[in-house]
Amino acid sequence: MSEELQPVFSIERLYVKDLSLEVPHAPQIFLEQGEPEVDMRVSTGSQKLEDGYYNVDVTVTVTAKLDNERTMFLNEVTQSGIFRLENIPEEDVQLLLGVACPNILFPYAREAVSGTVTRAGFPPVLLAPINFEAIYQQQQEAEAAGA
Protein backbone atom coordinates (compact mmCIF):
# COMPACT_ATOMS: atom_id res chain seq x y z
CA MET A 1 0.00 0.00 0.00
CA SER A 2 1.55 3.28 -1.10
CA GLU A 3 1.56 6.22 1.22
CA GLU A 4 0.08 9.40 -0.25
CA LEU A 5 2.25 12.48 0.14
CA GLN A 6 0.60 15.23 2.13
CA PRO A 7 0.41 18.72 0.61
CA VAL A 8 2.65 21.33 2.21
CA PHE A 9 1.97 25.08 2.25
CA SER A 10 4.06 27.09 4.68
CA ILE A 11 5.52 30.55 5.17
CA GLU A 12 9.30 30.31 5.33
CA ARG A 13 10.09 34.03 5.60
CA LEU A 14 8.37 37.43 5.34
CA TYR A 15 10.47 40.47 4.53
CA VAL A 16 10.41 43.99 3.12
CA LYS A 17 12.28 43.89 -0.20
CA ASP A 18 11.96 47.61 -0.99
CA LEU A 19 10.70 50.65 0.90
CA SER A 20 10.88 54.22 -0.34
CA LEU A 21 9.27 57.52 0.55
CA GLU A 22 9.59 60.81 -1.28
CA VAL A 23 8.30 64.15 -0.02
CA PRO A 24 9.39 66.37 -2.93
CA HIS A 25 7.82 69.62 -1.69
CA ALA A 26 8.89 69.46 1.96
CA PRO A 27 8.81 71.51 4.10
CA GLN A 28 6.39 73.86 2.30
CA ILE A 29 3.84 71.10 1.69
CA PHE A 30 3.21 70.83 5.45
CA LEU A 31 1.95 74.42 5.51
CA GLU A 32 -0.59 73.93 2.73
CA GLN A 33 -4.24 73.19 3.41
CA GLY A 34 -6.57 70.86 1.61
CA GLU A 35 -7.64 67.28 1.24
CA PRO A 36 -5.16 65.23 -0.73
CA GLU A 37 -6.18 63.00 -3.62
CA VAL A 38 -4.76 59.56 -2.80
CA ASP A 39 -4.02 57.04 -5.54
CA MET A 40 -3.04 53.44 -4.78
CA ARG A 41 -1.62 50.90 -7.21
CA VAL A 42 -0.95 47.26 -6.37
CA SER A 43 0.97 44.66 -8.32
CA THR A 44 2.01 41.10 -7.56
CA GLY A 45 4.61 38.74 -8.89
CA SER A 46 6.15 35.40 -8.10
CA GLN A 47 9.17 33.37 -9.01
CA LYS A 48 10.28 29.82 -8.34
CA LEU A 49 13.45 29.73 -6.24
CA GLU A 50 14.15 26.00 -6.10
CA ASP A 51 12.12 22.82 -5.78
CA GLY A 52 9.09 23.64 -3.68
CA TYR A 53 10.14 27.19 -2.76
CA TYR A 54 8.65 30.34 -4.25
CA ASN A 55 9.15 34.05 -3.70
CA VAL A 56 6.03 36.23 -3.91
CA ASP A 57 6.04 40.05 -4.04
CA VAL A 58 3.22 42.50 -3.38
CA THR A 59 4.15 46.05 -4.39
CA VAL A 60 1.98 48.91 -3.15
CA THR A 61 2.52 52.42 -4.51
CA VAL A 62 0.63 55.27 -2.85
CA THR A 63 0.72 58.81 -4.20
CA ALA A 64 -0.97 61.75 -2.47
CA LYS A 65 -1.43 65.02 -4.35
CA LEU A 66 -2.94 68.38 -3.45
CA ASP A 67 -5.22 69.89 -6.09
CA ASN A 68 -4.29 66.97 -8.37
CA GLU A 69 -0.90 68.51 -9.15
CA ARG A 70 1.46 69.00 -6.19
CA THR A 71 2.76 65.70 -4.85
CA MET A 72 2.58 65.53 -1.06
CA PHE A 73 4.29 62.15 -0.92
CA LEU A 74 5.06 59.07 -2.93
CA ASN A 75 5.44 55.84 -0.95
CA GLU A 76 6.34 52.48 -2.43
CA VAL A 77 6.61 49.21 -0.51
CA THR A 78 7.45 45.77 -1.84
CA GLN A 79 6.49 43.21 0.79
CA SER A 80 7.80 39.76 -0.03
CA GLY A 81 7.61 36.25 1.27
CA ILE A 82 9.24 32.92 0.67
CA PHE A 83 6.67 30.14 0.64
CA ARG A 84 7.08 26.37 0.56
CA LEU A 85 4.60 24.53 -1.64
CA GLU A 86 5.03 20.79 -2.10
CA ASN A 87 2.84 17.94 -3.31
CA ILE A 88 0.28 20.40 -4.68
CA PRO A 89 -1.16 20.17 -8.23
CA GLU A 90 0.25 22.86 -10.57
CA GLU A 91 -3.11 24.63 -11.07
CA ASP A 92 -3.46 24.91 -7.30
CA VAL A 93 0.12 26.19 -6.99
CA GLN A 94 -0.73 29.04 -9.36
CA LEU A 95 -3.87 29.85 -7.35
CA LEU A 96 -1.91 29.89 -4.08
CA LEU A 97 0.81 32.12 -5.59
CA GLY A 98 -1.76 34.49 -7.11
CA VAL A 99 -4.31 34.66 -4.30
CA ALA A 100 -3.35 33.08 -0.95
CA CYS A 101 0.21 34.41 -0.76
CA PRO A 102 -0.73 38.01 -1.70
CA ASN A 103 -3.54 37.84 0.89
CA ILE A 104 -0.93 36.93 3.51
CA LEU A 105 1.49 39.66 2.41
CA PHE A 106 -0.89 42.60 1.88
CA PRO A 107 -1.57 43.39 5.58
CA TYR A 108 2.18 43.71 6.14
CA ALA A 109 2.51 46.03 3.14
CA ARG A 110 -0.48 48.06 4.34
CA GLU A 111 1.11 48.48 7.79
CA ALA A 112 4.45 49.48 6.23
CA VAL A 113 2.72 52.17 4.13
CA SER A 114 0.75 53.53 7.08
CA GLY A 115 3.76 53.56 9.40
CA THR A 116 6.09 55.17 6.88
CA VAL A 117 3.62 57.89 5.94
CA THR A 118 2.89 58.63 9.60
CA ARG A 119 6.58 58.86 10.48
CA ALA A 120 6.96 61.32 7.58
CA GLY A 121 4.54 63.68 9.35
CA PHE A 122 1.35 62.93 7.43
CA PRO A 123 -1.92 61.45 8.70
CA PRO A 124 -2.06 57.65 8.37
CA VAL A 125 -3.19 56.22 5.05
CA LEU A 126 -5.80 53.52 5.58
CA LEU A 127 -5.75 51.15 2.62
CA ALA A 128 -8.82 49.05 1.91
CA PRO A 129 -8.41 45.29 1.56
CA ILE A 130 -7.70 43.96 -1.93
CA ASN A 131 -9.68 41.15 -3.56
CA PHE A 132 -6.74 39.19 -4.98
CA GLU A 133 -9.07 36.37 -6.04
CA ALA A 134 -10.99 38.71 -8.37
CA ILE A 135 -7.72 40.06 -9.79
CA TYR A 136 -6.46 36.51 -10.37
CA GLN A 137 -9.71 35.53 -12.12
CA GLN A 138 -9.49 38.60 -14.39
CA GLN A 139 -5.90 37.71 -15.29
CA GLN A 140 -6.91 34.11 -16.05
CA GLU A 141 -9.79 35.28 -18.26
CA ALA A 142 -7.53 37.75 -20.09
CA GLU A 143 -4.94 35.03 -20.70
CA ALA A 144 -7.63 32.63 -21.94
CA ALA A 145 -9.02 35.28 -24.31
CA GLY A 146 -5.55 36.04 -25.64
CA ALA A 147 -4.66 32.38 -26.22
Swiss-Prot record:
InterPro entries reported in the protein's UniProt record: SecB, SecB-like_sf
Cytoplasm recorded as keyword: yes
Keywords attached to this entry: Chaperone, Cytoplasm, Protein transport, Translocation, Transport
Organism of derivation: Neisseria meningitidis serogroup C / serotype 2a (strain ATCC 700532 / DSM 15464 / FAM18)
Free-text function comment from the UniProt entry: One of the proteins required for the normal export of preproteins out of the cell cytoplasm. It is a molecular chaperone that binds to a subset of precursor proteins, maintaining them in a translocation-competent state. It also specifically binds to its receptor SecA.
Record GO cellular component, one term: cytoplasm
Claim: Protein transport is one of the keywords in the record: yes
MF GO annotations: unfolded protein binding
Full protein name: Protein-export protein SecB
The encoding gene: secB
Similarity-based family: Belongs to the SecB family.
UniProt cross-references to PANTHER family, sorted A to Z: PROTEIN-EXPORT PROTEIN SECB (PTHR36918:SF1), PTHR36918
Gene3D superfamilies: SecB-like (3.10.420.10)
Location in or out of the cell: Cytoplasm
Subunit and partners: Homotetramer, a dimer of dimers. One homotetramer interacts with 1 SecA dimer.
Gene Ontology BP annotations: protein folding; protein tetramerization; protein transport
